Amino acid sequence: MKIKTEFFQDNGFLIIKNFYSKKLIYKIKKNIFEISKEIYKKYNSNFLKKNFNPNNFDYFVLKARKERNNEVTSAVYDACKKLSGFYEIISDKKLNKIAEKLIGSRRLGILPGGFGIRIDYPKDRYWKARLHQDYTSQLGSPNGIVCYTPLGNLTQRKGPVILYTKSHKRGVFNTKVDLSGLKKKKTYDPYYIKISKKNLKKYKIKYLNLKETDLGIFHFLLLHESGFNSSNKIRWSMVHRIFDFSHKQAINQNYIGGLMEGNIFDKNKNIKYL
């Protein structure tokens, strides 16, 4: 497989079509269906039998969401991170070789707080990821990649991830804290990138519209945000992050995690903007 390293370095992202097998995707969907069915059944006495359908594998998750059954949706979210099929995605040997070429290092690590399966519900704005860079939120190393594969083909209505191509070349953008959104319960995320609309428009937008066997990769420093899911289906995303242990800044900050682990730049002398 020929890897377009120069394209990645220039644009900050790469899409590899049909990277994962349909069999593996099917396995993960089936596991989610079976787990969500058992959890839903535990909390609902009026349980109706439902057979597995790969195109409707999240039937019980969506049903629980509509019924506002947070016990079910929270339990499913936590359980998804423990699926053996998901670990097959993370530990893929071909992907590791690709990561070595794109990152330019053979000393790679996976951020423990940076992998899981995202569940973006229809019409939900609260959990929509704001404009950010994964280095700021995850740290580990400024030299790293985000690996992204959907469960189910993405459409524009499902709100694919929005990439701002070539923005990684700018380095780390200034990250500010705004608690007003939290207080008004409009968002879970108090952090935002300080950039004008004029400057943001300098970067060409790429929508990460992928099929469920595709692999999307983008740089830790690339600006991106969630699209809005205006469909009536859940947008499922399998995500993990690979970083470079050998990078000087990674060593200086002791490979510490970022905002997602409660570490803010001005509270740790080892953490700094590039």
Language-model region placement:
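Non-heme Fe(II)-dependent double-stranded beta-helix
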Residues: 2-10, 17-131, 137, 262
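Short, conserved beta-strand element in jelly-roll/cupin
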Residues: 138-156, 209-212, 217, 241-246
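Active-site region of the double-stranded beta-helix
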Residues: 108, 133-140, 149-160, 166-168
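Short, solvent-exposed loop/turn segments at secondary-structure junctions
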Residues: 20-22, 117, 136, 153-155, ...
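Extracellular structured ligand-interaction cores
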Residues: 13, 142-146, 158, 205-207, ...
